[in-house]
């Protein structure tokens, strides 16, 4: 149980870090750069979510 909680906290921290870095990078003057960085952030968030789902499923199967 503690492993799952710890894993969720790590994933949440990584997602928050990724999103914070992406918004900091989006402060450039070009609108194209902003769109590109925001696109990268949404893709990174989607990938992190998929990884979290797979990890939680793997932990659930292992505990059973």
Swiss-Prot record:
Has the keyword Heme been applied to this entry? Answer: no
What does the UniProt keyword field contain?
Amidation, Amphibian defense peptide, Antibiotic, Antimicrobial, Cleavage on pair of basic residues, Cytolysis, Fungicide, Hemolysis, Secreted, Signal
Residues recorded with modification Leucine amide = 59
Q: Which GO terms describe its biological process?
A: defense response to bacterium; defense response to fungus; killing of cells of another organism
* Tissues where this protein is expressed: Expressed by the skin glands. Synthesized in the stomach and stored in a novel granular multinucleated cell in the gastric mucosa. Stored as active, processed peptides in large granules within the granular gland secretions of the skin.
Coiled coil, from the record: none
Q: Propeptide residue numbers?
A: 21-35, 60-64
Please tell me one Gene Ontology term that the record gives under cellular component.
extracellular region
The record's subcellular location field reads: Secreted
Signal sequence, start to end: 1-20
Q: Which family does it belong to?
A: Belongs to the gastrin/cholecystokinin family. Magainin subfamily.
| Function of the protein | PGLa and PGLa-H display a broad-spectrum of antibacterial activity against a range of Gram-positive and Gram-negative bacteria. PGLa also displays antifungal activity against C.albicans ATCC 14053. PGLa-H shows moderate antibacterial activity against the multidrug-resistant methicillin-resistant S.aureus (MRSA) but exhibits very little hemolytic activity.
What protein name is recorded for this chain? PYLa/PGLa B
Supply the source organism for this entry.
Xenopus laevis (African clawed frog)
- Supply the gene name: pgla-b
């Amino acid at each position: 149980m503690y492993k799952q909680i710890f894993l969720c906290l790590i994933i949440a921290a990584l997602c928050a870090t990724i999103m914070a870095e992406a918004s900091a990078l989006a402060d450039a003057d070009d609108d194209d750069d902003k769109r590109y960085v925001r696109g990268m952030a949404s893709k990174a968030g989607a990938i992190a979510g998929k990884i979290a789902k797979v990890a939680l499923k793997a932990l659930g199967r292992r505990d059973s």
